[in-house]
């Protein structure tokens, strides 16, 4: 098919080049030879009268003229798939797809493990690429470079649809042998004790409790920063440090690590874990099927949900804590 001199089959090649950023990998992904992929690039360059890609550090980086094309090309291909190709109902036993999902280490451990176990039985052809929290997940969603984002919903963009998974609350926790935690924990003591805190991404984005403390103008004595929640419980063991972490994470570790939950001196609010997907994938049958699986598993394991006070969305996802 051609449109104003452009072979629309080249859309697939351009989409893959934008995703892979490597000529050989892109060619292999769509079963083209490297010379054929090079020819496709040449034809795109002639069409747009622009280099489109510049080689930097062995990668094909889009030029300013090419960068806006990525979401447009991806959306065009998805519309063709959804409008022209007849989709059969998803048969889990025969479904073959890899989903790319951004989520925290905490959610991978306490929630997504259940998805993996279930689909290993029901849909063995489904695989996953679990990705750490990115500094700009909204941009990845906009381009359709990831299939799902699992986060507290207060950190999510309003530009894409989302679905609630479950409510979570934060608790203060320390080692069971910590003598400073024998009685009630007052705010002054909480602020003066050494804390272990999690931060995410290369930009060290704050976690939920850090954002809440920042909103109240409170500054803890953070003695140890780790790249995720799951490292915190083991690093509290045998120390006098404390941390503020999700309750489900404490429950996961309480049989193997001597932990003590203390009533928090602050009225820390509960928050909602949610799943979000690109607007480009709203009608994608595979994406719909996968999101329904996640919602089912969250409902099956964590109902009824407690009544909570909802946090407002922070002004910036990139807020930093001191």
Swiss-Prot record:
DNA-binding region(s) in UniProt: 23-42
Record key words, sorted: Activator, DNA-binding, Nodulation, Plasmid, Repressor, Transcription, Transcription regulation
Pfam assignment, any one: LysR_substrate
GO molecular function: DNA binding; DNA-binding transcription factor activity
Entry-linked Gene3D superfamilies: Periplasmic binding protein-like II, Winged helix-like DNA-binding domain superfamily/Winged helix DNA-binding domain
Keyword Repressor: yes
Keyword DNA-binding: yes
Top-level taxon: Bacteria
UniProt record similarity statement: Belongs to the LysR transcriptional regulatory family.
Role description: NodD regulates the expression of the nodABCFE genes which encode other nodulation proteins. NodD is also a negative regulator of its own expression. Binds flavonoids as inducers.
PANTHER family membership: HTH-TYPE TRANSCRIPTIONAL REGULATOR LEUO, HTH-TYPE TRANSCRIPTIONAL REGULATOR LEUO-RELATED
Protein name: Nodulation protein D
Gene coding for it: nodD
